[in-house]
Amino acid sequence: FSPDLKDPITTFNIAPGIQPGFWAFAPKSRGMSNESFASTKANPLLRLPSPSIRVEQGDKIIVTLENSHYFPHSIHFHGVDHPFQKENGEGNDGVPQTSNKLTMPGKVVSYELTPRQTGTMVYHCHVQAHTHILMGLIGMFIVEENRPNNWVQTFNIGAGFVRHSSKAVKEAYSQEYDLQYQDLDKELHSLIQT
């Protein structure tokens, strides 16, 4: 955010004249979350909802959370079969009450998992989940069937269209889209802008 602006929260154009503030998980990139120092409009690389993560069944996945926000956060892979603790005893589930501590501002935590079951699940922040999920800290986590020479699109960061579908999807469908619906709480989303 820009400390020079009255309202230093990134806003998203969701309809003409409607620009609520959101939080979002995003792939690491260069630059600010805003278009410029003079604008609160979101950088084009920062999209809502948080990006879909697509992986193959049986692949070892490492997701790193670098918390650049002013609140603590975590990532919980909801419905994904994975160990609650790493081999070294550190928490690995993103649930602060049971498995690991909060990821405080400026800190980094990596989650390791090897999904065994295919399907469409979600990942979300599990710190004050009733608020952080509504604020945008939720995304789709899709585990594709593992097939030889399968190439899956790891991140889908905009418009929902999956540019590189898996072999299983291509056999049955001509196109694939990731659709995730998000509720908005007008008061909550405007509260962070004041």
Pin down the residues of each PLM region.
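Short alpha-helical segments and helix-capping/turn motifs at coil-helix boundaries
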Residues: L46-P49, K60, V108, H126, ...
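A general structural signal for short secondary-structure junctions and capping/turn motifs
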Residues: I53, E66, T114, H130-I133, ...
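Solvent-exposed loop and beta-edge segments used for protein-protein assembly and interaction
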Residues: R47, V55-Q57, T103-P105, Q117, ...
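Residues in well-ordered beta-strands of folded domains
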Residues: H76, I142, D178-Q182
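N-terminal, post-signal-peptide metal-ligating segments of extracellular/periplasmic oxidoreductases
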Residues: F1-L102, T194
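Acidic-aromatic/histidine active-site loop/patch
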Residues: T11-F12, W23, P27-G31, F37-A38, ...
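Extracellular/periplasmic metallocenter environments
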Residues: E66-H73, V80-F84, G91-A159
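Internal, charge-rich low-complexity segments
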Residues: L5, P148-Q153, H189-T194
